[in-house]
Swiss-Prot record:
This is Large ribosomal subunit protein uL14m. It comes from Acanthamoeba castellanii (Amoeba). The keyword Ribonucleoprotein applies. Keywords: Mitochondrion, Ribonucleoprotein, Ribosomal protein. HAMAP family: Ribosomal_uL14. The gene is RPL14.
Length: 129
């Protein structure tokens, strides 16, 4: 579960490395946000590359929206099948729910597929679990 003030890794190549959650937008539960939920984050650490377009560049202190891809708590599926990740990871999105980066690193849980707005994130992911 992701709560306010949680530090998360960024799983795309948008330039941000670590972000901190400041608000839960579309949370599926009252306890915290899970896989597939949208949150508002602030960039804590970023890497500025010279070949990134200005529209895709993310700077330290910038407020963005993000969708949760993986959590340490994990996801329970039918038949007592349980999936966990080693880190809490997000992908940064714009106001049209399209990813800012052009590549996603690591696997993405299938529960993101429930929300049809994030179909582009699933299509650019390396592995879908």
């Amino acid at each position: 579960m992701i709560n306010v003030q949680t530090v998360l890794k960024v799983a795309d190549n948008s330039g941000a490395v670590f972000v901190s959650c400041i608000r839960l937008l579309n949370s599926s539960s009252r306890v915290g946000a899970g896989v597939g939920d949208t949150i508002t984050v602030v960039v804590k650490k970023s890497i500025i590359k010279k070949n990134i377009k200005k529209s895709k560049e993310v700077k330290k202190g910038q407020v963005c929206s993000a969708v949760i891809l993986r959590t340490i708590k994990g996801v329970k599926r039918w038949g007592n099948f349980f999936l966990r990740s080693s880190s809490n990871s997000v992908a940064l999105i714009n106001k049209y729910c399209l990813p800012i980066g052009s590549r996603l690193l690591g696997p993405v849980f299938r529960e993101i597929r429930v929300n049809l707005k994030f179909s582009k994130i699933i299509s650019i992911a390396q592995v879908t679990l």
